[in-house]
Structure formats: C-alpha cells, structure tokens
C-alpha cells in the first residue's frame, strides 16, 4: 500500500557528488517502511555522463568537471539557475512502473508550464520535455531494489552556454531553452514550488512535509 505522505527536502545549492552519494546511501539503506522523498537542489557547474553515455558526446568540457554516474541516459549539464529534482520513491510499494514514473515526471513539468501558457510536450523516443523542438528539461533515472533515484533537471534562469560543449543527451546540435525566456517561472524557487505541486498530485501523494537539508545519517 502506498504511503500518501511525501517528504520534500530543500537542499539549496550543493556539490553534485555529495548529493549523488547521499541518494545512493538513502536508497541502499531504506526498507519497506522508509518514507518517499523529493530532493530539491541546484548544483555548481558539472557535466554528468550517464550509463549510456559516449565520450565523443563530450566535445569541450574545459574547466567544468565531468562525472561518470549510475543513472540512465547520456551526458547532460547542471549549473546554477537550474532546478534539479530527485524523486527517491519506493515504486515497488506504490506499484508504479518505471515507464509510468517517467511519464508522470514529464507530465508534471508539462502541467506546470501550462500554468504559464507554455505549450510543452514529451517525445516517445527522447526522454525529457520540449518547447518548439528545444529542450527545457532533461530526465535520467536509476531503479535499485524497486526504488528510484536521480531524476529531472529543469532549465529556469541559467547560463545555457555550457550545453554547447556537449551533445546534450547524445543529440548533436540539440538546442536548449529555459523557463525565463519562455515566460515561465523566473526563479528556481518558484519553479520548484510549482513542480512539487504538479508532481505530487500525479504520483498520488496527499500530504507534503517540508524539510531544510538532508536528514542526519
């Protein structure tokens, strides 16, 4: 039976690797009674290379670090002004399939942007969310022990130039776009507050409990 309470952890700006390892630790040590959590964070500039990633898609990283990680998908960029959301959910307990989870995440972004009269959409063959063939949100998950970690990255108000140093998600010439220039949410906080609402509703959570920072381990 699904626990209808979702714990939201607001992490501020944090180093990618420390949050990644904390996600792994939470997933590896959780049990059937552990609460589902949503981590809201921004990262300093970093390229992350997923398990399907190919080195030739990293064109010119320059001084931005490249980290090989254990999520699905290929290379992407994280940086200040981008909303990153990590759903740490027991999908086995809630009986949500992986494809259904991906669809819910994409739809939550589409629904949130629709509040700003932005016509966004998903693509069956290329996970993420798009507006006029430009990508506004990237998606990469990992499922371990029936539980999800990693998640989504929504471009809000950031420097998009580093995306030109890679083939985003393995697609050469893929153009990125962000909420601010589309007339969407203007800050990461605003985007996060709105996305929490749409995502929790789609996933069936009825009570949200907010926390600042990670739980003491």
From Swiss-Prot:
Q: Where does substrate bind?
A: 71-78, 138-140, 151-153
Where along the sequence does the record put site: Lowers pKa of active site Cys? 135
- Give GO terms for biological process: protein modification process
Chief subcellular location: cytoplasm
Q: Does the keyword Cytoplasm apply?
A: yes
Assigned keywords, A-Z:
Acyltransferase, Cytoplasm, Transferase
Q: What is its EC number?
A: 2.3.1.181
Localization in the cell: Cytoplasm
Question: What are the catalytic residues?
Answer: 169 (acyl-thioester intermediate)
Q: In which pathway does it act?
A: Protein modification; protein lipoylation via endogenous pathway; protein N(6)-(lipoyl)lysine from octanoyl-[acyl-carrier-protein]: step 1/2
GO cellular component, as recorded? cytoplasm
Q: What class of enzyme is it?
A: transferase
Cysteines engaged in disulfide bonds, as pairs? none
Please provide, alphabetically and separated by semicolons, the GO molecular function terms listed in this UniProt record. Answer: lipoyl(octanoyl) transferase activity
Catalysis performed (reactions): octanoyl-[ACP] + L-lysyl-[protein] = N(6)-octanoyl-L-lysyl-[protein] + holo-[ACP] + H(+)
Q: What residue stretches are annotated with the BPL/LPL catalytic domain?
A: 32-207
Xref: PANTHER family: LIPOYLTRANSFERASE 2, MITOCHONDRIAL-RELATED, OCTANOYLTRANSFERASE
Family as reported in the entry's similarity comment: Belongs to the LipB family.
Leftover remarks: In the reaction, the free carboxyl group of octanoic acid is attached via an amide linkage to the epsilon-amino group of a specific lysine residue of lipoyl domains of lipoate-dependent enzymes.
**Which function does this protein serve?**
Catalyzes the transfer of endogenously produced octanoic acid from octanoyl-acyl-carrier-protein onto the lipoyl domains of lipoate-dependent enzymes. Lipoyl-ACP can also act as a substrate although octanoyl-ACP is likely to be the physiological substrate.
Its name, as the record gives it, is: Octanoyltransferase
Q: What is the lineage of its organism?
A: Bacteria, Pseudomonadati, Pseudomonadota, Gammaproteobacteria, Alteromonadales
């Amino acid at each position: 039976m699904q626990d209808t309470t979702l714990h939201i952890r607001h992490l501020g700006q944090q180093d990618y690797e420390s949050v990644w390892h904390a996600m792994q630790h939470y997933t590896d040590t959780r049990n059937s009674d552990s609460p589902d959590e949503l981590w809201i964070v921004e990262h300093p500039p970093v390229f992350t290379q997923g398990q399907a990633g190919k080195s030739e898609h990293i064109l010119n990283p320059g001084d931005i670090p490249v980290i090989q990680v254990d999520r699905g998908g290929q290379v992407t960029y994280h940086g200040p002004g981008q909303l990153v959301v990590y759903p740490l959910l027991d999908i086995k307990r809630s009986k949500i399939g992986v494809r259904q989870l991906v669809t819910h995440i994409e739809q939550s972004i589409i629904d949130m942007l629709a509040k700003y009269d932005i016509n966004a959409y998903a693509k069956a063959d290329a996970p993420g969310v798009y507006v006029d063939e430009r990508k506004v949100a990237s998606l990469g998950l990992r499922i371990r022990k029936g539980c999800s970690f990693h998640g989504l990255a929504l471009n809000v108000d950031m420097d998009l130039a580093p995306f030109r140093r890679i083939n985003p998600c393995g697609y050469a010439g893929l153009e990125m776009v962000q909420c601010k220039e589309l007339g969407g949410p203007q800050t990461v906080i605003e985007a996060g507050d709105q996305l929490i609402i749409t995502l929790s509703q789609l996933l069936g959570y009825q009570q949200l409990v907010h926390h600042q920072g990670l739980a003491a381990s």
